[in-house]
């Protein structure tokens, strides 16, 4: 029962899918970050369904683009927008953290979101769906969430409040780090075996930059930064996937 509740906690927090109502406690939150990658399985499955439907190219690209947003409810995009606003302020750490708490959407966030969706839609239009590509992208969607959870459990926290702090302090951080690190290593091996080494490379580069930006600009990670990372990781892996197909290596 605790395992099912743990999965439900992860889906209730990181997706828009309806979940049973129950009290969150130390037991069912301890490994919620380990269940977070399962949201990627749902995104990948729906992405594959969109890929096999007899849709016009533009409609299929739109479906590819919108599936993650529909499943997650835009929680990661919200963090991406807030972080873009904070980084664009060029203020000190305290100023950036204050902007992250601001519920309003600034001009830079709107500009970055419009640019993000334009690029994402274009890249989706460049991807030709095949069963192999479907498996690759599903593994990638699971992997980016494993890295995101790993960062929350391993990186320093920017503040002692907020979503990242709540999940990090509730977690068995050592065990969560071990589980997610092993999971991502297995996913990386699977991606590489299927010819998706470029996606692994892209994710690794974004993950490294995430650590540098989080520590240098904000003093550590926050929930908003976790969302920013996930969206950046996703679009760069998508670019790597499109590039591999264009170059004929997939």
List the predicted regions and their residue ranges.
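Multi-pass membrane catalytic core of lipid/isoprenoid biosynthesis enzymes
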Residues: 29-46, 86-132, 136-137, 175-190, ...
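N-terminal beta-alpha supersecondary unit
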Residues: 9-12, 26-51, 165-169
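Terminal transmembrane helical module of multi-pass membrane proteins
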Residues: 185-231
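Acidic (Asp/Glu-rich) catalytic motifs at the cytosolic membrane interface
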Residues: 67-105, 213-233
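Membrane-embedded alpha-helical segments that form the functional core of polytopic membrane enzymes
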Residues: 34-84, 135-139, 196-216
């Amino acid at each position: 029962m605790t395992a099912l509740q743990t999965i439900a906690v992860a889906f209730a927090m990181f997706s828009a899918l309806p979940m049973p109502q129950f009290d969150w406690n130390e037991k069912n939150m301890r490994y919620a970050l380990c269940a977070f990658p399962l949201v990627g399985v749902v995104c990948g499955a729906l992405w594959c369904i969109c890929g096999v439907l007899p849709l016009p190219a533009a409609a299929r690209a739109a479906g590819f683009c919108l599936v993650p947003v529909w499943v997650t409810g835009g929680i990661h995009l919200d963090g991406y927008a807030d972080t873009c606003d904070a980084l664009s302020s060029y203020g000190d750490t305290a100023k950036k953290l204050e902007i992250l708490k601001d519920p309003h959407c600034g001009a830079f966030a709107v500009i970055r979101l419009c640019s993000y969706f334009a690029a994402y839609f274009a890249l989706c239009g460049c991807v030709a769906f095949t069963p192999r590509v479907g498996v690759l992208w599903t593994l990638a969607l699971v992997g980016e969430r494993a890295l995101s959870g790993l960062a929350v459990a391993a990186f320093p926290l920017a503040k002692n409040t907020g979503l990242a702090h709540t999940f990090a302090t509730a977690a068995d951080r050592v065990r969560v780090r071990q589980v997610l690190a092993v999971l991502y290593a297995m996913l990386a091996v699977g991606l590489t075996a299927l010819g998706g080494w470029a996606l692994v490379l892209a994710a690794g580069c974004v993950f490294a930059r995430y650590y540098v930006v989080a520590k240098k600009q904000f003093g550590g990670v926050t929930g908003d930064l976790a969302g920013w990372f996930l969206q950046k990781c996703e679009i760069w892996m998508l670019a790597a996937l499109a590039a591999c197909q264009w170059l004929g290596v997939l």
